[in-house]
């Protein structure tokens, strides 16, 4: 209850702040994902970032250090795609529960040609076997 009162007080004190959603009836989700390879100087873990838009309105975003060290920039980007695909899957389920039909397929934008090729290639090699689970997850969501 205390947390709810705190939120209400914050909203009352800051009436001009907020995220504005553009008007329109588009139901197209667009997702953008990116990562930086080995950015953390202490752990050499990459940082994943993604954002999801419904039409022109930003509805979800996240930036987080990856759980494991990536051995290539393509692997770091691919893990970013997997995190983004998981968020998009959750958002689609949420919108279905709310009775909102989302246009499929969802556009996912990634700036790594290598990560896109890994997602599209049905054959695993020794160099990509360790990201096998993420790869299957992304493939199920984007194909």
List the predicted regions and their residue ranges:
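Divalent metal-binding acidic/histidine catalytic loops
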Residues: 1-143
């Amino acid at each position: 209850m205390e947390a709810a009162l705190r939120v209400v007080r914050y909203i009352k004190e800051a009436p001009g702040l907020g995220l504005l959603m553009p008007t329109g009836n588009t139901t197209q989700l667009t997702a953008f994902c990116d990562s930086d390879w080995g950015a953390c100087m202490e752990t050499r873990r990459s940082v994943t970032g993604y954002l999801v838009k419904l039409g022109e309105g930003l509805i979800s975003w996240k930036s987080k250090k990856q759980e494991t060290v990536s051995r290539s920039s393509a692997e770091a980007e691919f893990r970013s795609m997997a995190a983004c695909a998981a968020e998009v899957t959750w958002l689609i389920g949420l919108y279905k529960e709310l009775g909102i039909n989302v246009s499929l397929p969802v556009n996912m934008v990634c700036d790594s040609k290598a990560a896109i090729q890994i997602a599209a290639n049905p054959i695993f090699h020794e160099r990509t076997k360790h990201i096998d689970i993420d790869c299957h997850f992304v493939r199920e969501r984007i194909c």
